[in-house]
Design a protein with these regions (language model features):
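Rossmann-fold NAD(P)-binding glycine/threonine-rich loop
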Residues: 43-64, 182-224
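Rossmann-like adenosine-cofactor binding region
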Residues: 18-38, 133-209
Length: 224
């Protein structure tokens, strides 16, 4: 309780990621802080911002910082590869893998899968992202062509926080496809349709803290 008792004197308060894991209700925590204090938390909601304003506390979402996204991309990619190795009955070498999205996580994952010998195709919306993927020796398709391209892949990883793996796209995948969705809740996969079609669909969240907690902590420290 020592830390909580020191809240009224603190100029800066570091809260967890996600913010809801603070232990005590946020209103109680920030109500103990002095007006004008700076609170840093992860995945800050609108309701949390309302609570902070009422307490006179400035609340900053460090999870929204682009540098933290880049730092976390590597442990996320490595954690995803660990899941694929656990769940697949064959090597990633020679596997046809579809990666949806080419932001920091998609890029980090795609190049590492290719380094392991996987035949990686990136599906991205923007032409510049597809060009960057091809420049790295990867294949690339527009997101609008997902349903037409899906039959070639038995392993799919999504990094896009939007409904991209729809029932139509899932129906075009080979039965029993392994799908790992890395996007924030609710993800980009129609999980009910995936189960109905006989696929294995996993929503893998917070991989840096699960697979590389020390690295995740260092990344957070560098950000805040």
């Amino acid at each position: 309780m020592g830390g909580v008792q020191q809240l009224p004197q603190a100029d800066c308060i570091l809260l967890p990621l996600p913010l809801e894991q603070s232990g005590l209700p946020l209103a109680q925590l920030l109500g103990m802080a002095k007006p004008g204090a700076l609170a840093l938390g992860g995945k800050v909601t609108d309701s949390a911002r309302t609570i902070a304003r009422a307490a006179g506390v400035e609340l900053v979402d460090y999870f929204a910082r682009p540098e933290l996204t880049v730092y976390n991309a590597i442990p996320t990619a490595e954690g995803c590869i660990g899941i694929l190795l656990e769940r697949r009955s064959r090597t990633l070498w020679g596997a046809a893998v579809l990666v949806l999205g080419f932001g920091p996580v998609g890029r980090a994952l795609a190049v590492r899968l290719a380094a392991l010998g996987a035949r990686v195709t990136v599906a991205a919306r923007r032409p510049v992202q597809r060009a960057m993927a091809e420049e790295l020796g990867l294949l690339a398709v527009p997101l609008t062509d997902l349903a037409a391209a899906a039959a070639a892949f038995d392993t799919v990883v999504n990094t896009i926080p939007a409904p991209v793996l729809t029932a139509q796209v899932l129906a075009a995948l080979p039965k029993g496809c392994l799908i790992v969705d890395l996007a924030s809740k609710p993800g980009g996969t129609d999980f009910a349709a995936a189960r109905r079609l006989g696929h294995t669909a996993l929503h893998a969240l917070s991989l840096p803290t699960v697979w590389a907690p020390e690295t995740a902590g260092e990344a957070l420290a560098r950000t805040v």
